[in-house]
Amino acid sequence: EIKQLAVRLIEDKRTIGVIGDLFIDCTGFSSILLENYLGTRFIKFDDLANDKAFYARIPYLSQEHREKHMHNVTDCEAAENGWMWTIPLWNRIGVGYCWSSRFAMENETKPEFERWIEEKFDVAPGEYEIGTIDIKHGYHEKAWNLNVLGIGLSYGFVEPLESTGLLTTHENILRLVDVLSRRQGYVTQIERDWFNYAAQREVIGFSKFVAMHYALSMRTDNPYWRWCTQRNEYMQEQFDMSVRVVDNYERMGSSLDLDQTMDVNMNGLNYIVAGMGVKLGRDWLNDRDPDELVFVDNAHRTYEKEVYDFVCSEECPSHYEYLKEYIYGGDELRAELI
C-alpha cells in the first residue's frame, strides 16, 4: 500500500482533511512529515562530532564599541571543544559556540563561551543571554518521498562552518522549481529518484568538505582534537560517493540536468590544505604557462597595492560608515530601527 500523505488540520476545534499532490516539509529538525509520518530513514554524519551549539546576541554598548566590532565578514575561531562564530550585524553581534557533547559537558563549555564573549566584546554577564541548540547532523535517505519533499532542516543539516546547510536549502528549492516546470507539474518516480540522488550527493559532499577542516588540523591538546585529528577514520566513507556512482544513472540524470549539483568534487580542499600549512603533493605551477603566471602575479600586486593604499587613506569609510551612508541613506534613526 502506498502511504501517500493527507493532512488533518485542527482549526477552531474542527478537523479539516487536506489532500495535496505535494507537501513540502518545513518543520525543521522535527521532520514531522518526511520522517515521523512517512518513516523516511535518517542517516547520521558520524564523522562530525559537534552536536550542540550555544548562541547569544551581543548589544553594541556605544558608538565606539560599534565601530570597533562591526566588520563585513563572519569570523570562525577554533575552541577547546569545537569552534566559535562572530557575525557583526547592524544592530547587534551574533555569536555562537558549536561543540561536542561526546567530549565535554555543558558546565565546561558554557563558562568557556561566557569568558570568550566577555573578554572579546567587553560586556558584562547581565548584558547578554545564552541559548542552546541541539544539532542533528545528517540527511534523510530520500528528500522526496512519495508526495512529501523535505527542504531545509527537515531534509538534512551540516554544521554551519561553511554555511553549506543554507546552500543545500537554496539548491533544493531551485531543483524543485526546475523539475515542476518541465511538464507543468507532472513528475514521475524516476524524476524523484534523480532529485534524491542529486540532493544526497550534494549534502554528503558538503559534509566531507566540512569534516576536512577538523581532519587536517594539527591540534592534539585535548580529547576532542585528538579524536578529530588522530582517531576518527574519515577515509572509511570519504570517497564512497565515487564508488557508489552508477555511470548509466548519472548519464540519464544529466540529460535532464537533475544530477547537477554545486561543486562538491573536493577541489576546495586545496585551500583547506594550504591553510593548514600542508605542502601540496604536486607542483601546481608546472601546469601553467610561465607568461600567464607573470601576468597574473603582476596584476595581483598592482591590485593589492591599490587596495592597501585606499584602505589606509582617509577616503576609505569604516564598515559602519559605509552601511550608514550607502545602505541606510545616512538616516541614523531609520538605520537604528531596521
PLM region spans:
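Long, low-complexity C-terminal extensions of enzymes
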Residues: 178-338
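Acidic/polar loop patches that form or flank catalytic/metal-binding clefts of enzymes
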Residues: 63-67, 125-129, 184-192
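Extended charged low-complexity segments that act as oligomerization/scaffolding linkers
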Residues: 7, 64-67, 116-120, 179-182
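Contiguous mid-protein beta-loop-alpha structural module that forms a pocket-lining wall or clamp
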Residues: 159, 164-180, 188, 202
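Predominantly flavin-linked oxidoreductase catalytic cores and closely associated redox partners
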Residues: 1-112, 173
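Conserved FAD/dinucleotide-binding core of flavoprotein oxidoreductases
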Residues: 78-134, 156-167, 185
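FAD-binding beta-loop-beta segment adjacent to the flavin cofactor pocket
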Residues: 131-151, 156
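Short, conserved secondary-structure transition motifs
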Residues: 57-61, 136-140, 196-205
